[in-house]
Amino acid sequence: MFSLISLSHEESAESANKYVWRVSLWVESERQTPPSEVFLPFFRVEYMKVRKVSIVVLVLTLFIIPVIIPPAHSSINTSTTYATAYVGETSISSEPFILDVANLPWLNPQGSNIRFFEYSNLTGQLYAYEQLFSKTTWTVNTVESTGWETLPYWQNGQLVFNCPSAPHGGQYIAWRYTPSSNTFNVTIHITSWPSGINNPYSPGIAIYSPTVGDQPTDIGTSGFLALLVTFNGQIWYHETNGNWVELSVVYPTPSTAYPFTFTVTFTENSAGNVTVSTVYINSTAYTVNVNTPFPWSQIGYVGIRGDIDNLFYVSYFAVSPSPFVNSVESTDWKTLPYWQNGELVINGTGASAGGQYIAWRFTPSSNTFNVTIHITSWPSGISGGTYPGIEIFSPNVGNQPYAQASGFLALLVTFNGNIWYHGISGISGCDLLKSSAYPTPSTAYPFTFTVTFTENSAGNVTVSTVYINSTAHTVNLNTPFPWSQIGYIGITSCYDLFYVSYFAVSPSPFVNSVESTDWKTLPYWQNGQLVFNVTGASGSQYIAWRYTPVGNTINVTIHITSFPSGIPSGDNPGIEIFSPNVGDQPYDEVSGFLSLLVAFNGNIWYHGLNGFVLLKSSAFPTPSTAYPFTFTVTFTENSAGNVTVSTVYINSTAYTLNFNTPFPWSQIGYIGIRGDPSNLFYVSYFSTTQQLYAYELVTNPYTNTPYTGTVYMAIFPYPISYDVYVSQAPIVYSQATLPLVTVSSPSQVTTQYPIISTSTYMVIPSIGAYSGNTPLFLYPQMAVSEGIVPVIPMVESTSWKTLPYWQNGQLVLDVAAACSSQYVAWRYTPSSNTMNVTIHITSYPSGIQYNPGISIYSPNIGDQPYDYASGFLALLVTFSGNIWYHGTNANWVELRSSAYPTPSTAYPFTFTVTFTENSAGNVTISTVYINSTAYTLNVNTPFPWSQIGYVAIRVDTQNLFYVSYFSISQGSSPFVLVSPSYAQGFVGSQYAYPYFMNTTTVLVNNTAVPKGLSVFSGYMPGANTVFSTFLYMNTTPQSPVLVLMPAPYVSFNALSNGFSITADAQILSLYGYPATYTNPSFTYTPPGIIGMSGTNTFTFKGAQTQLSASTTPPSSTTPTPPSSSSSSSSSSSISTSPNTIQVVLNGSVYVHVPLLFHPALSTPNGSVLFSTSVNSTGVYISSYVTSAITTPLNVTIEYTNGTVIKSFTIEPGQTFQVPLVNGDENVIISYGNHTVTIPISANNVNVLSLRNAISAVLPPIYALPLFLLFAGSFFISLAVRSVPKFAGMGSIIYIFFVAPFLIVIGIPTSVVYGTVVGALIIIIIGLWASRSQD
């Protein structure tokens, strides 16, 4: 077997970039026996008998050896079925949870197309969608200075930079960036700058070299390069020695009295350095052309720099030409489209030409689609001679200077009534197809503009209808634009300035599933809220979403922020349930469907097939519309199979109704919002929650047929709370093949439609299943696209009246009338002896009541009704200055009161607690920071440091507050738990491993995985995380199983028909677990993440890492596998050491795998070029496909004395197996001036390990005789080694019995072949010696 056993970093002044791995080969030999004494025994036999036997043995060997050698891997069939199963937090005794689908598709890796939600309960059918407005997906940072007093934080969707009194100037936050061309633009939009730009300080946009890291400040620190373009007109260069040099002062300072946009264009000059080409301030261009000494090749990070006495708010920061807002866009904008207050600002003023556009990829799935835009403001007005509007482009449009360029097709429907066709020839081919086809909307007010496009009989596009504020204008204009050439849908500007709050394409209703048709103003989005305006409508209007309950209870919640019209007497706005056949009616008083209305004014109505009947009036009070209110209705299924209106909650006050209705539970098809003709109200939150067994991905809700085309999927780990419709960007039906997943039992899920993939890259949703209230499966990890990405697990108390929810990018925590002591907590285990927990609260309407604050819990907290239950540990640091400890007996003990002042809730505040480990191994509360003011406490507590399992926000009775940021940090990079958006930077990167599985073969990273154990390591630069994955392919025929274990500890037993694991694990299999493997039992703990900054973690200079508590074997409280499969895998047999993952296989064969902090060759800008893997067939090197590789990697294999064995090159994406030789060897891989050496040597395997390995693949009745034959052959050889006349018999035993099984247990065939050849030579020598003596 092979094993990676150690990791060393050998650096010297001569070779500072060489990182060395050591790979060891375990072969069977005797360490103490001199080579001259290693002879196989043979017995005295007559010459002719020996010769006959030898001939027979030689013939049999020719047949037997090829049979026992594994065959070459066959080609891969990409159309085979595929399934996944996941390990749960509790022992599992039922059948495994299986998602039975075909090959899963490639997932668009942009984080904007995946939504993750982390709160209890799952609501409704989940729609796949694509966000046309992807915005900028923020991560908190890649590198960041460490001298901030208040770290940058999110508030109202803006990143706040606060440097009022930092101990050092020059604080920065920067994101990883490597330009792909010789020009790029950096744009920042600053909405507010209360402090003004204070001179002589220098905030601005900065670029840094890859070596910057997390410095205390960028002033006076050495070892990196920087280039700073300040907001006050200066350009500075930072040398590696730490000195800043001023290069120029060339443009004015923008006024901070108003919001401003600041863009810098950087270009590469002929010397290979950076030129600051142009600065744009609010679209005014200032030509700079300042050449700098900063090498273009050294651009590694782009960031924002703050300085002393500067406070400003950033709503937008992006680098282009990398895609950041759109799919394609024109290139002659003076001001690129940007986000401001939740709207896309289209500013074409000052452009060098009209026809500036921004467009998104779209391919229609039917012969009709609608494009809708809602414009909230148009300061410039629509000029008669211009042509802004909605435009369709062919797929080859790309990024042109303007929409009139040549080489593509376009169809423009302008806002001022004109329709234009653009042929291939560009301007000369633009034809006005129709003028004044409809009136121009007034720009004095917001307006909605919708165009319906249809495919005509000639296969071209017809502009069918234009709607302006819901007024239809029939056009029916046939155009020459081919329907098959629709590739992009976009917005075109012509020297205009306007603000867009909504833009979407829909092949079916675009905001909802069904809605009434007599609106005067269709519902639209404004400032993140759905505006429900029924004024002027001819009847009661509704908007409803497809929903079918899986359980027998559902909760429907709406949060109304404003109700200007009030609820007039006689009106009945409210929450309404519809039957599946409701469709798009003029209003809900028509006949032919069922509905149930729970009105805000206390009335309950039932709509039979012929109309409404009042079932109950004044069932509960009417909420006051003078203030925002939350309204929740709980519906249950009664014994008659009908709907019961169980409870209504108004602002968390419960009103028990238990009112039975005639509406059949089985007829629930849509859930919606209803308004009467005089109503106007604003909705910020609307959702349906329930306990589900699994989840659903829905296709077309009308025809129940799958879409075709590009696949996008919304993936939701369980349990979640899904705010289905509150989205600042539009939710659009995907052009995709999607399955409708239905639940057939609590542990079995099947899909109605297959998902076909043309790629071997996979996406595996993270899924959970529930039986009653008992979680069977909950795995907080998701393999997306090519690799494994961690998702933070969470626990939450269960007595909330209003569960925590998101509103305007903030987490709303409301315990106004709930049971006290509620919490929401995230899994966290510290890897050092210090951690900081920070919360930023933007608003606290209730004031601080009782004991809300930051708390830490032991790992066994789980989902309790409240945190004064028993059985776990807790430590609470309240906002009001008190510190409490909770022992396992449920008693809270106050450790300190009034330890620090209570922050004022009249303003937003930041609250940080520093926890440290004291000499007793317990937690000390070291310091509390309130708005950057430090209060030293040093309060020792009885809470053991090793018991930190969750970090939480605790809420007490009568508290309501809004959280925009919550994070944990142990160094310079915070681990953000609550943030306005969350990007999975690892998804789709070249650092993940692609894998493929069919019934006979498993490929990982283009390498065939043999039966038995294999090890792969990966590195995620953006998250500073090492991913090490163990893969075990089951020995049962036709049932391959991969076990992905990211944790640095695993105890592993190989069984004849399955396996037993005690580890973090994810099971991937074609058929779930092997059918013959009954009573599976797994122990699950959340993944351990190894940080990469600080004094006790990996650095690029080889500092050792001490494994944290999360990397040690599970404690005695963790469930263990059944005794039949765990007898040889106890934690006592495992010893841990720094930098090492340890595996116990069959009790005594140890596999040691180093935690590779940078498991591959890297370029100067940090791009990883290759990785290593090892398994029972050998050592493999895999070259990544990355833009950083421009030439092949050079590989040299040589003996340790320097003699070259082989030299060759490998292209990106190739995997090669290292050829093994007799003796030690080095594999040297180089790229440019960077080199990695991988030495390979031979070690020994002990006899006990061999016996255990043999026993794992044979029944005991055969394994024992085999072991005795193996041992006996060497015993006989030792006893009669001096009698050469009795040659051959020991060799015959070895060839016939021992060699085949050495191959079976994983000894490389090349090694076994060598010993077989040696044995044959000994037989021949024996025969010759016998003849000579005779």
Curated annotation (Swiss-Prot):
Disordered: annotated segments: 1107-1135
Primary location group: host cell
Domain of life: Viruses
Localisation per UniProt entry: Host membrane
UniProt KW keywords: Host membrane, Membrane, Transmembrane, Transmembrane helix
Transmembrane segment boundaries: 53-73, 1256-1276, 1292-1312, 1313-1333
Low complexity composition-biased segments: 1110-1135
GO cellular component, one term: membrane
Regions annotated as coiled coil: none
Membrane-topology annotation of the record: Multi-pass membrane protein
Protein name, entry field: Putative transmembrane protein ORF1334
